[in-house]
Protein backbone atom coordinates (compact mmCIF):
# COMPACT_ATOMS: atom_id res chain seq x y z
CA UNK A 1 0.00 0.00 0.00
CA UNK A 2 1.40 3.40 -1.00
CA UNK A 3 0.23 5.38 2.04
CA UNK A 4 1.90 8.63 1.01
CA UNK A 5 -0.03 8.65 -2.27
CA UNK A 6 -3.28 7.94 -0.41
CA UNK A 7 -2.71 10.78 2.09
CA UNK A 8 -1.70 13.15 -0.69
CA UNK A 9 -4.84 12.50 -2.77
CA UNK A 10 -7.08 12.71 0.32
CA UNK A 11 -5.50 16.10 1.05
CA UNK A 12 -6.42 17.25 -2.45
CA UNK A 13 -9.99 16.03 -1.96
CA UNK A 14 -10.29 18.04 1.27
CA UNK A 15 -8.89 21.14 -0.42
CA UNK A 16 -11.37 20.80 -3.27
CA UNK A 17 -14.31 20.41 -0.88
CA UNK A 18 -13.15 23.51 0.99
CA UNK A 19 -13.09 25.51 -2.24
CA UNK A 20 -16.52 24.20 -3.26
CA UNK A 21 -17.91 25.39 0.08
CA UNK A 22 -17.06 28.95 -0.93
CA UNK A 23 -20.19 28.94 -3.13
CA UNK A 24 -22.71 28.53 -0.27
CA UNK A 25 -20.62 31.03 1.73
CA UNK A 26 -21.12 33.59 -1.05
CA UNK A 27 -24.85 32.76 -1.04
CA UNK A 28 -24.93 33.42 2.71
CA UNK A 29 -23.13 36.76 2.27
CA UNK A 30 -25.48 37.80 -0.54
CA UNK A 31 -28.70 37.06 1.33
CA UNK A 32 -27.39 38.66 4.51
CA UNK A 33 -26.70 41.83 2.53
CA UNK A 34 -30.24 41.62 1.11
CA UNK A 35 -31.64 41.67 4.64
CA UNK A 36 -32.68 38.02 4.84
CA UNK A 37 -32.24 36.05 8.04
CA UNK A 38 -29.32 33.87 7.07
CA UNK A 39 -26.95 31.40 8.65
CA UNK A 40 -23.88 32.98 10.22
CA UNK A 41 -20.84 33.07 7.96
CA UNK A 42 -19.06 30.99 10.58
CA UNK A 43 -21.19 27.99 9.55
CA UNK A 44 -19.09 27.76 6.40
CA UNK A 45 -15.92 29.61 7.42
CA UNK A 46 -15.00 27.00 10.05
CA UNK A 47 -15.34 23.93 7.79
CA UNK A 48 -13.62 25.76 4.91
CA UNK A 49 -10.68 26.67 7.15
CA UNK A 50 -10.45 23.11 8.52
CA UNK A 51 -10.60 21.54 5.07
CA UNK A 52 -7.96 23.83 3.58
CA UNK A 53 -5.63 23.52 6.59
CA UNK A 54 -5.91 19.74 7.07
CA UNK A 55 -5.81 19.20 3.32
CA UNK A 56 -2.52 21.08 3.07
CA UNK A 57 -1.11 19.04 5.97
CA UNK A 58 -1.95 15.78 4.21
CA UNK A 59 -0.41 17.07 0.99
CA UNK A 60 2.96 17.29 2.77
CA UNK A 61 3.02 13.50 2.40
CA UNK A 62 3.39 13.92 -1.37
CA UNK A 63 5.68 11.18 -2.67
CA UNK A 64 8.22 11.70 -5.42
CA UNK A 65 5.91 9.79 -7.74
CA UNK A 66 2.17 9.43 -7.05
CA UNK A 67 1.49 5.74 -7.68
CA UNK A 68 -2.16 4.71 -7.49
CA UNK A 69 -3.26 1.17 -8.23
CA UNK A 70 -6.42 -0.84 -7.52
CA UNK A 71 -5.84 -1.11 -3.75
CA UNK A 72 -5.01 2.57 -3.33
CA UNK A 73 -7.96 3.51 -5.54
CA UNK A 74 -10.42 1.62 -3.35
CA UNK A 75 -8.98 3.09 -0.13
CA UNK A 76 -9.04 6.63 -1.54
CA UNK A 77 -12.63 6.17 -2.72
CA UNK A 78 -13.84 4.79 0.63
CA UNK A 79 -12.01 7.24 2.89
CA UNK A 80 -12.66 10.13 0.50
CA UNK A 81 -16.42 9.72 0.67
CA UNK A 82 -16.33 9.39 4.47
CA UNK A 83 -14.27 12.57 4.77
CA UNK A 84 -16.47 14.66 2.46
CA UNK A 85 -19.60 13.48 4.27
CA UNK A 86 -18.05 14.18 7.67
CA UNK A 87 -16.86 17.70 6.87
CA UNK A 88 -19.87 18.37 4.65
CA UNK A 89 -22.14 17.89 7.66
CA UNK A 90 -20.45 20.68 9.66
CA UNK A 91 -22.47 23.58 8.13
CA UNK A 92 -25.71 21.84 9.19
CA UNK A 93 -24.42 21.33 12.73
CA UNK A 94 -22.80 24.74 13.26
CA UNK A 95 -25.79 26.66 11.84
CA UNK A 96 -28.18 24.69 14.04
CA UNK A 97 -30.18 23.55 11.00
CA UNK A 98 -29.50 19.93 12.01
CA UNK A 99 -27.83 20.08 15.45
CA UNK A 100 -27.63 16.30 15.89
CA UNK A 101 -24.40 14.90 14.41
CA UNK A 102 -25.87 11.58 13.30
CA UNK A 103 -28.77 13.31 11.53
CA UNK A 104 -26.46 15.85 9.90
CA UNK A 105 -24.08 13.11 8.76
CA UNK A 106 -27.03 11.14 7.38
CA UNK A 107 -28.35 14.17 5.47
CA UNK A 108 -24.94 14.95 3.99
CA UNK A 109 -24.23 11.35 3.03
CA UNK A 110 -27.67 11.15 1.45
CA UNK A 111 -26.82 14.26 -0.54
CA UNK A 112 -23.37 13.24 -1.76
CA UNK A 113 -24.52 9.73 -2.65
CA UNK A 114 -27.61 11.24 -4.36
CA UNK A 115 -29.87 8.97 -2.29
CA UNK A 116 -32.31 11.80 -1.54
CA UNK A 117 -33.47 10.52 1.87
CA UNK A 118 -33.87 13.30 4.44
CA UNK A 119 -34.36 13.77 8.19
CA UNK A 120 -35.86 17.25 7.70
CA UNK A 121 -39.54 18.12 8.01
CA UNK A 122 -39.67 21.93 7.91
CA UNK A 123 -37.34 22.57 4.98
CA UNK A 124 -38.55 26.04 3.99
CA UNK A 125 -37.54 27.54 7.35
CA UNK A 126 -33.86 26.82 6.75
CA UNK A 127 -31.43 29.56 5.61
CA UNK A 128 -30.90 29.88 1.86
CA UNK A 129 -27.18 29.10 2.12
CA UNK A 130 -27.90 25.84 3.95
CA UNK A 131 -30.52 24.88 1.36
CA UNK A 132 -28.04 25.72 -1.40
CA UNK A 133 -25.36 23.55 0.19
CA UNK A 134 -27.84 20.71 0.70
CA UNK A 135 -28.77 20.68 -3.00
CA UNK A 136 -25.17 21.32 -4.07
CA UNK A 137 -24.12 18.05 -2.41
CA UNK A 138 -26.37 16.31 -4.97
CA UNK A 139 -24.63 18.06 -7.84
CA UNK A 140 -21.15 17.25 -6.52
CA UNK A 141 -22.07 13.63 -5.91
CA UNK A 142 -23.84 13.24 -9.23
CA UNK A 143 -20.59 12.71 -11.11
CA UNK A 144 -18.40 12.03 -8.08
CA UNK A 145 -16.00 14.29 -6.23
CA UNK A 146 -13.09 11.97 -7.04
CA UNK A 147 -13.87 12.24 -10.74
CA UNK A 148 -13.95 16.01 -10.23
CA UNK A 149 -10.50 15.80 -8.65
CA UNK A 150 -9.14 13.91 -11.67
CA UNK A 151 -10.80 16.41 -14.02
CA UNK A 152 -9.23 19.54 -12.55
CA UNK A 153 -5.86 18.31 -11.30
CA UNK A 154 -3.17 18.66 -13.99
CA UNK A 155 -0.84 15.76 -14.74
CA UNK A 156 -3.36 13.14 -13.65
CA UNK A 157 -1.74 9.99 -15.05
CA UNK A 158 -3.14 6.69 -16.20
CA UNK A 159 -3.06 5.39 -12.62
CA UNK A 160 -5.98 7.73 -11.89
CA UNK A 161 -8.11 5.21 -13.77
CA UNK A 162 -8.11 3.05 -10.63
CA UNK A 163 -9.63 5.90 -8.61
CA UNK A 164 -12.25 6.61 -11.25
CA UNK A 165 -13.14 2.92 -11.62
CA UNK A 166 -13.55 2.62 -7.85
CA UNK A 167 -16.05 5.48 -7.84
CA UNK A 168 -17.91 5.38 -11.16
CA UNK A 169 -20.37 2.48 -11.55
CA UNK A 170 -21.24 0.71 -14.76
CA UNK A 171 -19.40 -1.24 -17.45
CA UNK A 172 -18.32 1.89 -19.34
CA UNK A 173 -16.24 3.47 -16.59
CA UNK A 174 -13.28 3.45 -18.92
CA UNK A 175 -11.50 6.01 -21.00
CA UNK A 176 -13.27 8.10 -23.60
CA UNK A 177 -10.08 10.00 -24.48
CA UNK A 178 -6.42 8.88 -24.40
CA UNK A 179 -5.81 10.56 -21.02
CA UNK A 180 -8.02 9.79 -18.03
CA UNK A 181 -7.87 13.42 -16.85
CA UNK A 182 -9.20 14.54 -20.23
CA UNK A 183 -11.94 11.89 -19.99
CA UNK A 184 -13.08 13.14 -16.59
CA UNK A 185 -12.83 16.76 -17.73
CA UNK A 186 -14.92 16.08 -20.84
CA UNK A 187 -17.63 14.33 -18.82
CA UNK A 188 -17.74 17.15 -16.26
CA UNK A 189 -18.03 19.77 -18.99
CA UNK A 190 -21.04 17.91 -20.42
CA UNK A 191 -22.51 17.59 -16.91
CA UNK A 192 -22.01 21.30 -16.18
CA UNK A 193 -23.40 22.46 -19.53
CA UNK A 194 -26.52 20.32 -19.08
CA UNK A 195 -27.01 21.79 -15.60
CA UNK A 196 -26.72 25.36 -16.90
CA UNK A 197 -29.18 24.58 -19.71
CA UNK A 198 -31.74 23.32 -17.21
CA UNK A 199 -31.25 26.39 -15.00
CA UNK A 200 -31.88 28.69 -17.96
CA UNK A 201 -34.93 26.73 -19.13
CA UNK A 202 -36.47 26.80 -15.65
CA UNK A 203 -35.69 30.47 -15.05
CA UNK A 204 -36.82 31.87 -18.40
CA UNK A 205 -39.40 29.20 -19.23
CA UNK A 206 -41.40 29.85 -16.07
CA UNK A 207 -41.60 33.52 -17.01
CA UNK A 208 -43.31 32.53 -20.24
CA UNK A 209 -45.74 30.28 -18.36
CA UNK A 210 -46.37 32.96 -15.74
CA UNK A 211 -44.86 31.21 -12.70
CA UNK A 212 -41.64 33.27 -12.46
CA UNK A 213 -39.37 30.79 -10.71
CA UNK A 214 -36.60 32.59 -8.82
CA UNK A 215 -33.00 32.12 -9.93
CA UNK A 216 -32.21 30.51 -6.57
CA UNK A 217 -34.98 27.93 -7.03
CA UNK A 218 -33.93 27.29 -10.63
CA UNK A 219 -30.37 26.60 -9.52
CA UNK A 220 -31.07 24.33 -6.55
CA UNK A 221 -33.77 22.43 -8.46
CA UNK A 222 -31.31 21.84 -11.30
CA UNK A 223 -28.67 20.66 -8.82
CA UNK A 224 -31.12 18.13 -7.39
CA UNK A 225 -32.16 17.00 -10.87
CA UNK A 226 -28.58 16.65 -12.10
CA UNK A 227 -27.70 14.40 -9.18
CA UNK A 228 -31.05 12.58 -9.61
CA UNK A 229 -31.43 12.73 -5.84
CA UNK A 230 -34.41 15.05 -5.54
CA UNK A 231 -33.57 17.34 -2.60
CA UNK A 232 -35.98 20.26 -2.75
CA UNK A 233 -36.16 23.62 -0.98
CA UNK A 234 -39.93 23.31 -0.49
CA UNK A 235 -41.81 21.20 2.04
CA UNK A 236 -44.04 19.83 -0.75
CA UNK A 237 -41.01 19.24 -2.98
CA UNK A 238 -41.58 19.97 -6.67
CA UNK A 239 -45.37 20.04 -6.18
CA UNK A 240 -44.88 23.24 -4.20
CA UNK A 241 -44.20 25.16 -7.42
CA UNK A 242 -47.66 24.32 -8.81
CA UNK A 243 -46.23 24.21 -12.30
CA UNK A 244 -46.57 21.41 -14.84
CA UNK A 245 -43.82 23.10 -16.83
CA UNK A 246 -41.34 22.72 -13.95
CA UNK A 247 -42.39 19.10 -13.46
CA UNK A 248 -41.93 18.22 -17.13
CA UNK A 249 -38.54 19.94 -17.32
CA UNK A 250 -37.36 18.00 -14.27
CA UNK A 251 -38.72 14.71 -15.64
CA UNK A 252 -36.90 15.16 -18.96
CA UNK A 253 -33.63 16.22 -17.37
CA UNK A 254 -33.77 13.46 -14.75
CA UNK A 255 -33.93 10.98 -17.61
CA UNK A 256 -31.09 12.73 -19.48
CA UNK A 257 -28.87 12.93 -16.39
CA UNK A 258 -29.49 9.23 -15.72
CA UNK A 259 -27.91 8.28 -19.04
CA UNK A 260 -24.29 7.14 -19.05
CA UNK A 261 -22.36 10.32 -19.88
CA UNK A 262 -19.93 8.45 -22.10
CA UNK A 263 -22.80 8.20 -24.59
CA UNK A 264 -23.04 11.99 -24.82
CA UNK A 265 -19.31 12.15 -25.44
CA UNK A 266 -19.62 9.63 -28.25
CA UNK A 267 -22.49 11.60 -29.79
CA UNK A 268 -20.53 14.86 -29.62
CA UNK A 269 -17.51 13.23 -31.26
CA UNK A 270 -19.78 11.68 -33.93
CA UNK A 271 -19.15 8.11 -32.77
CA UNK A 272 -22.78 7.25 -33.38
CA UNK A 273 -22.28 3.49 -33.68
CA UNK A 274 -20.71 3.23 -30.22
CA UNK A 275 -23.57 5.27 -28.76
CA UNK A 276 -26.57 3.55 -30.33
CA UNK A 277 -25.35 -0.03 -29.99
CA UNK A 278 -24.94 0.39 -26.22
CA UNK A 279 -26.94 -2.32 -24.44
CA UNK A 280 -26.93 -0.40 -21.14
CA UNK A 281 -28.83 2.52 -22.68
CA UNK A 282 -31.45 0.27 -24.28
CA UNK A 283 -32.00 -1.50 -20.96
CA UNK A 284 -32.24 1.87 -19.20
CA UNK A 285 -34.96 3.05 -21.60
CA UNK A 286 -36.93 -0.20 -21.31
CA UNK A 287 -36.83 -0.18 -17.50
CA UNK A 288 -37.93 3.47 -17.35
CA UNK A 289 -40.82 2.99 -19.79
CA UNK A 290 -41.97 -0.21 -18.08
CA UNK A 291 -42.15 1.28 -14.60
CA UNK A 292 -43.63 4.57 -15.83
CA UNK A 293 -46.50 2.61 -17.37
CA UNK A 294 -46.97 0.33 -14.35
CA UNK A 295 -46.90 3.15 -11.80
CA UNK A 296 -49.18 5.35 -13.92
CA UNK A 297 -51.76 2.56 -14.19
CA UNK A 298 -51.74 2.10 -10.42
CA UNK A 299 -52.13 5.77 -9.46
Model-derived regions, located:
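Membrane-proximal intracellular helices of multi-pass ion channels
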Residues: 1-299
Amino acid sequence: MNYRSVFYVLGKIMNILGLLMLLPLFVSVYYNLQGFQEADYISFVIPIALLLFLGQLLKFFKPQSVKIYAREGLVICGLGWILVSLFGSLPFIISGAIPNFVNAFFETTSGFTTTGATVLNEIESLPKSILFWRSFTHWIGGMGILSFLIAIVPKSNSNSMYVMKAEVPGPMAGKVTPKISESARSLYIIYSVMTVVQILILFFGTRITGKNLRLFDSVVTSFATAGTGGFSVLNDSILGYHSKFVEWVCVIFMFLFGVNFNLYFFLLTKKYKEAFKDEEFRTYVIINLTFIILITLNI
